[in-house]
Amino acid sequence: MNTTVTIVGAGLGGLTLARVLHIHGIPSEVYEAEASPTARLQGGMLDIHDYNGQLALEAAELMDEFRGIVLEGRQALRALDIDGTVLFERADDGTGGRPEAQRGDLRRMLLDSLPEGTVRWGHKVTGARTLDDGRHEVAFENGTTVVADLLVGADGAWSRIRPLLTGAVPEYSGTSIVETYLYDSDTRHADVAKTVGGGSMFGNGITPGLAINAHRETGDTLHAYVELKKPLDWFDAVDFTDAEVAKARVAAEFDGWAPELTALITESDIAPIHRPAYALPSGLRWERVPGVTLLGDAAHLALANGEGANLAMLDGAELGKALAASPGDVETALAEYELAMFVRCETPIEEDFLLESIFGDEVPQQLLNIFESQQRES
């Protein structure tokens, strides 16, 4: 296959695709809006699942490198009631199928595996159009354009490539996440650190739509995800530019919860960050459009739970393998890839039930059922 694959988006999915293509001798160019690899924080920890993310890393021939960035002990898990009572606890004995790593380390690992110059930084896409000859032109904010024989949109929730294939747009799910960080937690936030434990902590009560979850990340950092089912105008009324005001307003929704849980909000060392959760229509499909396809959130954005990144990596790996297997028939490769992706993303996964357990009507019992099922299977 002599065609250079044009990839928009240097996230985990787009970079996995570029890596698998590179292994098979297929050139690619990745265009990324960010100015550099260090332009912004790449998010927190990510558990790489043995049934999708790890399969992608195996296809990318990066499992050894991945093992080198795994955070030991972070598969430990506990579920707490609102009074701080531990309802379920599982230690990390090294046998779990979801090792944790920092998203930034994963991205750096993928970048280091590509030829120098593969990623073109500082290329924010403003639009894309189909040319008369069937190829696609991508326009960038810096005034330049590129014409692609084969274009892949790996550009996330608000993809500029998606309109070439479908008019679907993300809609607010009704749920938002408020992120907080507590640094040097063992020293400065000892009670909270003890409550969270060595890995992940899920705090849930009987009220649907409220949860305080946290992970222990590198450097004794606690990264909390406070989940609230509220309309967007509720969050619009919160002044997130004033850290103390925002912390107090969000914490007020958890009246009656144990102070060591609400401290994940009130003791945050940064201003809380509001992240509304958007999703594309469930079961989204489109008719084949020659020379272009999507992967990851650009194709099947769902509620943020870690599964999306794993699926994006698997999409990238599967697309790369499909193109390598049919170098003389790109359209057949794209059609087969899309069909498999559609089916894969329509299949209910454990994380779907996990979200329902957090925001459904029978919390925290549903959540405990999932954790206990996981423990039996392991």
List each model region and its residues.
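Accessory recognition modules or surfaces
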Residues: M1-T6, L12-G13, T38-D50
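Alpha-helical, largely C-terminal catalytic domains
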Residues: A335, R344-S378
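Short, solvent-exposed loop/turn segments at secondary-structure junctions
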Residues: T38-A39, A128, R160, A302
